Amino acid sequence: MPGKRHAIVIHSPHSGRAPQLEEALKLLQEAGIELVRVEPITSLNELPPQGATWLAQGIDLAIAAGGDGLVGGMIRHVIKTGPRLAILPLGTANDTARSLAIPQDLAGAVEVIVAGQEAAVDVGMALPTAASSSASGLSDEEEAGSDYFCHTLTIGLNVEFARLATSSEMRERFGAMTYPVAALEALRAHEPLEVVLKFEGLSGPASARQSEDELRYQVLQVAVINAPVFGGPLQLSIPGASVTDHLLDIVAVQGPDWKEIAAAIGQLFAGSEGTQGEASAGTTRHPAELTTLPGLHHWRASSVTISTPAGPCEVTLDGEVKGQTPITVRIAPEPLQVLVPASWQAQTAEAGR
């Protein structure tokens, strides 16, 4: 990339690889990047979007040094008027970085920041009320009440897991075992939840796309997915999902047979969506569903509204508890400009032809 880059680095002191921040900063400086400011993500709390301010200060690069939650928290500062975004994957899973083929080693990630290419990628947007159906964008009121996410929005089981896993008390008590302990406790305490789903822009046969039905399910979890890779180093991926297709993947997980659910999720990530003969007895399938795996429902759409008849339920965005149902989730009108490896950019362009 021509010219000297001037960067702000926003980091998370509590991310999984936070102790490597100093090494990462040294590599950035050695690569010729001037670090104008280095600040924790908490410094942005309660502030309006800072992108225009950063540009006015001569900053042309915003580096997110952390995990998925930090990247998601940076979006509102850079998505419209702001420096391009770069990612230093210092989190635990780093699924957003993995979805963009950004190397997990510091030297490789810095090389992408120095010599990568700018790509326009989708981000999700969550609104507490129904989103505007206008193709031209959102009203000022809708946008003011919205939150962005880069990877996944969830309701159900993952909300309780996120609350436990990010608890300072849990982290101090269990250390490296926090995640598995939090997962077991969330499973023990969680009860199925009734949800109502209403889609816009369903992908699938014409007859399915025309359906306006509200769908009701008892679920353990609903995940609205933008970036396809899950599971950190396991590199699990939702088949057919992309961060450049302007669509969200919605997966509803039903119970209560955990062995069946675990097997079905494994098949989903392995690229099998099942066949019509594999649907569980009595299972009703919407015509736009992409899977017949027992215990799972999978759709692809530009927007989904989620409500919970029993009352408001909290949601997570990129693992952070933010907002509650009823909520409308859609692809943001503007893409996010982010630095990616040239090879990823080329493969994505080829796949889109």
Segments (PLM) and residue ranges:
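Glycine-rich phosphate/pyrophosphate-binding beta-alpha loops
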Residues: 154, 158, 223-240, 321
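Gly/Ser/Thr-rich active-site loops/lids in small-molecule metabolic enzymes
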Residues: 169-178, 230-233, 238-260
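ATP/NTP phosphate-donor binding region
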Residues: 1-62, 72, 76, 134, ...
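N-terminal glycine-rich "phosphate-gripper" loop used for MgATP/nucleotide binding
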Residues: 64-68
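A generic structural signal for short beta-strands and their flanking turns/coil linkers
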Residues: 191-193, 218-220, 244-249, 300-302
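ATP/nucleoside-binding phosphotransfer catalytic cores, i.e., glycine-rich phosphate-binding loops
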Residues: 211, 242-245, 252-353
